[in-house]
């Protein structure tokens, strides 16, 4: 966006960190506009949110709105995505990606409520988040201007940002040295930068924030029971919980046993690769439980289709295409497939592993009578001959034609 565009009131996605603390006064100076701070509570922790309104006002914001999005994020964004089986590039449970559309949606709602004519985010010009936010803004509020300071200003270092605030007597608790870049919400925490920028470096202990080292985890395993209804975990160990409560509870259980760690080099949407240490303890447990019930209740073609949905959904969510017809269609299809995904799963947690050890479902298609190798009381093996001849017919014809 050009600086020549005139705006009167801007709603900025504010985190309380160094970048967004600089953005508020920068917006006022460069756009001569009123700045409203919007804070999304997505479960990043009380420590991150403590005193954040006062900090935003001290930076120059007229008002600061803190919006609790935790329950909605898990129930309306994370759990529906889980039903698709989405794992970006086979490993990543999309912790950061799934939080962005609801943050953008809530930011637009605040902008509408206060009569703002512009939106602002603090994403850099190298990452995925700029695309996720601006893609959501385009779908939800195409009439609002979007300001991306990192693509406009000439500040290039933490030192320059700190100097910028000091020159304006704006208080800031950030330090000059920041080893890692972290992003946390109720679902996961990511750690990037520092030693991780060299792929040959093994992660340090401080690359992990939530989970214990699996080698240092308890020597005694722990089992938990999860009740699944329509592709969502609704109770743990016999206690009914909301989706958010399920995630919080299982995060604590999984972290204690070192569950949910991945060290991944992923393909960013902008073309470059990035490395990060991601922790999703509760999500890893939930994903194992859902896939276990699916094994019982989905027939072969439904299971294959659900896998295809998962791959496509992972890219749509990662690429910031949540508010698109295709994403809505995939979520609707997975919702239909999940109608029979009901059951109970027992998972053993032990030194970094979440292992399914028991599973059952009233909708199970598994039949012990059909699967055993005993007497043919319910399955006549001679019937297989005709099926095989038809199944291999195209191969037979191709072979005959080649002679």
From Swiss-Prot:
Q: What class of enzyme is it?
A: ligase
Cited SUPFAM superfamilies: Adenine nucleotide alpha hydrolases-like, Argininosuccinate synthetase, C-terminal domain
Does the record carry Cytoplasm as a key word?
Answer: yes
Reactions catalysed, as given in the entry: L-citrulline + L-aspartate + ATP = 2-(N(omega)-L-arginino)succinate + AMP + diphosphate + H(+)
Stated EC number for the protein is 6.3.4.5
Coiled-coil region(s) at which residues? none
The record, for Gene3D superfamilies, names:
Argininosuccinate synthetase, chain A, domain 2 (3.90.1260.10), HUPs (3.40.50.620), Single helix bin (1.20.5.470)
Name this polypeptide is given: Argininosuccinate synthase
Which CDD domains does the entry link to?
Answer: ASS (cd01999)
Upper lineage: Bacteria, Pseudomonadati, Pseudomonadota, Gammaproteobacteria, Vibrionales
Question: Which coarse location class describes where this protein primarily resides?
Answer: cytoplasm
